[in-house]
């Protein structure tokens, strides 16, 4: 069960309620309430627990409103059924006399056609009899039912408007803002939907403080993405925002994590693009996808296009192994990036589109693309201070024994990448559990209590994990990255 599932179910419940499908809405509301109840058992933070309890109460109020609407509609159905039964029981003899109704003001009908007939020109004989009362018009059951239906619809509209107001009052943990829709005229609908799926509308929930070290990279990304929206009058002319940033470094150093932090912190539309997004088996569609991607980014600006492993899309041109279709895609990507819409083409820097790229093979990237990615920064292996900070971030949810010395562990991790350090922490956190279940049967393992499983991690566990987990980056690779960044870097 995830928070994303709760959010989607709340959205579906409200949509069904607004559309009048109250049975389906109640199913989703009940499911959301059950999901939140289960989630509350896993929340240990008191403040967060109170917030989610408040969310549960507000959603429960919505569900009660929907139940009241369903009861009201059910009562209307019963009334209409009894009215039809009474209509069938009315006598149909011509001899009975109806009482005169209350006069009702009626609007004149536009241009009624008169029937010319000699049969009904003479009045009926019984209308001239003394004491006889002419049968008056009696409102039919059908008209009463239509009036009642209008009342039901007006009440439903009031409930819908009330539901919208309550939706606006709910916390941001559940509600989502509605965005403008991109006009897909001239493009294949499937292509537009494929790119819209790559827009990260949900929060990746990675903050700047979740990333250890990499201070210079954080400052550069904030300068390239955040500051132009805060100070648009400053970032004009030669100070226009950077159109492209390339992150270069060994695997596991935090390049993709920095991109997630940009999507979380910078409040821009974030496109997560890979090689599968921009390739198609049909001739010419890959180039259309590239152009459509940038047009959508300009529409949803300010926007950030993150291309992970960009060397797989835009490798060096002119090689013997290059295919014609691949060359056309690279050409379209280069053309679109040169007109991405910085201050040189758009007077408002807050409507910028920035390309953020990451690669482990910078030497394979095309020279023209390297020129368009104006900032080329090196994401190195973490320093001793960064390794210790990363250990604290990875172990903040674990209970550590008193003998654990993080500084000593960080010193023993020289040459480890961020991903390697995370693997060491994960392996060390499982050591106590492995010792506890050693020699037990599956039935005995299932009967273990929670306290027995959650034992503190000791220094010995980290020493054993370091022996099992080796570093994944060689010294020769580091030397090659440093040589490239000295020659082509732009920090």
From Swiss-Prot:
Enzyme Commission number(s) from the entry: 5.6.1.1
Chain intervals for the UniProt region annotation (Interaction with KATNB1): 1-29
Pfam families referenced in this protein's UniProt entry, alphabetically: AAA, AAA_lid_3, KATNA1_MIT, Vps4_C
Catalytic activity, as annotated: n ATP + n H2O + a microtubule = n ADP + n phosphate + (n+1) alpha/beta tubulin heterodimers
Post-translational modification: Phosphorylation by DYRK2 triggers ubiquitination and subsequent degradation.
CDD domains tied to this protein: Kp60-NTD (cd21748), RecA-like_KTNA1 (cd19522)
Main subcellular location of this protein, as a coarse class: cytoplasm
Job of this protein: Catalytic subunit of a complex which severs microtubules in an ATP-dependent manner. Microtubule severing may promote rapid reorganization of cellular microtubule arrays and the release of microtubules from the centrosome following nucleation. Microtubule release from the mitotic spindle poles may allow depolymerization of the microtubule end proximal to the spindle pole, leading to poleward microtubule flux and poleward motion of chromosome. Microtubule release within the cell body of neurons may be required for their transport into neuronal processes by microtubule-dependent motor proteins.
HAMAP family: Katanin_p60_A1
Protein name per the record: Katanin p60 ATPase-containing subunit A1
Organism the protein comes from: Rattus norvegicus
Organism ancestry: Eukaryota, Metazoa, Chordata, Craniata, Vertebrata
């Amino acid at each position: 069960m995830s928070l994303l599932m709760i959010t989607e179910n709340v959205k579906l419940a409200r949509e069904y309620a607004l559309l009048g499908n109250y049975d389906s809405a109640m199913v989703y509301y009940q499911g959301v309430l059950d999901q939140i109840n289960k989630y509350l058992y896993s929340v240990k933070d008191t403040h967060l627990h109170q917030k989610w309890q408040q969310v549960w109460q507000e959603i429960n109020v919505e569900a009660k409103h929907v139940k009241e609407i369903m009861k009201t509609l059910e009562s209307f159905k019963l009334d209409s059924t009894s009215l039809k039964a009474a209509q069938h029981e009315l006598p149909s003899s011509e001899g009975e006399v109806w009482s005169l109704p209350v006069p009702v003001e009626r609007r004149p009908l536009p241009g009624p056609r008169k029937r010319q007939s000699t049969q009904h020109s003479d009045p009926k004989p019984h209308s001239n009899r003394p004491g006889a009362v002419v049968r008056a018009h009696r409102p039919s059951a059908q008209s009463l039912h239509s009036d009642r239906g209008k009342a039901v619809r007006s009440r439903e509209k009031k409930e819908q408007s009330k539901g919208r107001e309550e939706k606006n009052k709910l916390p941001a943990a559940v509600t989502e803002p509605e965005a403008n829709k991109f006009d897909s005229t001239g493009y294949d609908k499937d292509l537009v939907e494929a790119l819209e799926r790559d827009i990260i509308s949900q929060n990746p929930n990675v903050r700047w403080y979740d990333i250890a070290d990499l201070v210079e990279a954080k400052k550069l990304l904030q300068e390239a993405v955040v500051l132009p929206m805060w100070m648009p009058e400053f970032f004009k002319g030669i100070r226009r925002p950077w159109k492209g940033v390339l992150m270069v470094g060994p695997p596991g150093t935090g390049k993709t994590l920095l991109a997630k932090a940009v999507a979380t912190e910078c409040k821009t539309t974030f496109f997560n693009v890979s090689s599968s997004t921009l390739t198609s088996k049909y001739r010419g569609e890959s180039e259309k996808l590239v152009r459509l991607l940038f047009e959508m980014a300009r529409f949803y600006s300010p926007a950030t296009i993150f291309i992970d492993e960009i060397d797989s899309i835009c490798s060096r041109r002119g090689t013997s192994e290059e295919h014609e279709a691949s060359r056309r895609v690279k050409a379209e990507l280069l053309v679109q990036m040169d007109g991405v819409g910085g201050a040189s083409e758009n007077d408002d820097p807050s409507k910028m589109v920035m390309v953020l790229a990451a690669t482990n093979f910078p030497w394979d990237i095309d020279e023209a693309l390297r020129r368009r990615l104006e900032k080329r920064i090196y994401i190195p292996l973490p320093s001793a201070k960064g390794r210790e900070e990363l250990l604290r971030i990875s172990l903040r949810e674990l209970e550590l024994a008193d003998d654990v010395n993080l500084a000593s562990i960080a010193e023993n991790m020289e040459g480890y990448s961020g991903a390697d350090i995370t693997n060491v922490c994960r392996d060390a956190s499982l050591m106590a559990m492995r010792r506890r279940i050693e020699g037990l049967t599956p039935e005995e393992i299932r009967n273990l209590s929670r306290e027995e499983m959650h034992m503190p991690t000791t220094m010995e566990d980290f020493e054993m994990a370091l022996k099992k987990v080796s570093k994944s980056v060689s010294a020769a690779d580091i030397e090659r990255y440093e040589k490239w960044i000295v020659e082509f870097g732009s920090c």
